[in-house]
Amino acid sequence: MINHKPISKKNIFKILKNLKKFNLKTEWHNLNQSNELIIAQDIISKINLPPFNNSAVDGYAILNNDIKKNKELFYNRRVAAGDNIKLKIKKGEAIRIFTGAKMPLNSNTVVMQENTKTNNNKVLIKKAPKIGSNCRIMGEDIKKNTIILKKGT
């Protein structure tokens, strides 16, 4: 009886990769069914993730410069997650926004609702955030046309 030493999975893959005449067949699999398979080609993102600028918290979308002069802003509009909007914030205005909602086009900061106090159609900013706070920027997780899974892995 021949006694062969076992080869690790890692070494088997190295050996197979180095065989020039070895022709690997490619198949399409769902990611959750691809355990222990090798990726035949780079997988490239077709979209940005997130696909648009959105709020990371419930609160108020603002123009950060507005709160340097006045901590109280007018509000009468709101944006919820799933709303497909193209709003712009006016000077001195805040827009009520919810987690995952698309940011107004020119807004650059979201104030967490816990740091505000409302009275009628006015919102008082109790704690001013830094510019860009509580915003998820389009493509910050994955940029369109970038490799997300590399061939051979």
Ranges and model annotations:
Residues 2-3, 60-153:
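Short, glycine/charged-enriched hinge/interface segments at domain edges or termini
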Residues 1-69, 121:
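Short, low-complexity N-terminal leaders and the immediately following helix N-cap/first helix
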